[in-house]
């Protein structure tokens, strides 16, 4: 049996997420996956070029000003993603030590310290 009532369908515009800062920052954070895809494609191209002895093509590709600009934008996006992740992690992860909740700043600073140490280790390994 069918009903004659009309179902209420709430109108949702395509720019709904631009109204509140929280949603805007969330959508920007989620859009950083594009930067990750770009980085993975460049890395894949570099590995393939290295294996096929076409490293000169990859070096000239990497020196293209457009690629450099895209890499800088990608780095900024990835840093934004990491920064927002490190701010959110203490809010959703509860660590209890001796029946007391760990200070969220300790966890956030520990994440940044680990990131810095891993980055420093990568730089040392590259330039040895």
UniProtKB/Swiss-Prot annotation:
User: Membrane-spanning regions, if any?
Assistant: 31-51, 67-87, 106-126
Q: Name one GO molecular function term.
A: succinate dehydrogenase activity
Localization recorded for this chain is: Cell inner membrane
What topology does the record note for this protein and the membrane?
Multi-pass membrane protein
| Keywords, alphabetical | Cell inner membrane, Cell membrane, Membrane, Transmembrane, Transmembrane helix
**Record's GO cellular component, any one?**
plasma membrane
- Subunit structure of this chain's protein: Part of an enzyme complex containing four subunits: a flavoprotein (FrdA), an iron-sulfur protein (FrdB), and two hydrophobic anchor proteins (FrdC and FrdD).
Q: What does this protein do?
A: Anchors the catalytic components of the fumarate reductase complex to the cell membrane, binds quinones.
The family annotation for this protein states:
Belongs to the FrdC family.
Name the chain's protein.
Answer: Fumarate reductase subunit C
Species name: Haemophilus ducreyi (strain 35000HP / ATCC 700724)
């Amino acid at each position: 049996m069918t009903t004659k009532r009309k179902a209420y369908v709430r109108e949702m515009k395509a720019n709904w997420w631009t109204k509140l800062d929280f949603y805007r920052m969330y959508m920007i954070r989620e859009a950083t996956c594009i930067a990750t895809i770009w980085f993975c494609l460049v890395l894949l191209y570099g590995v393939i070029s290295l294996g096929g002895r076409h490293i000169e093509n990859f070096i000239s590709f990497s020196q293209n000003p457009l690629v450099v600009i895209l890499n800088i934008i990608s780095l900024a996006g990835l840093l934004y993603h990491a920064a927002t992740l490190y701010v959110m992690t203490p809010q959703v992860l509860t660590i209890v030590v001796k029946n007391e909740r760990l200070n969220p700043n300790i966890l956030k600073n520990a994440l940044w310290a680990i990131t810095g140490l891993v980055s420093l280790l990568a730089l040392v390994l590259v330039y040895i």
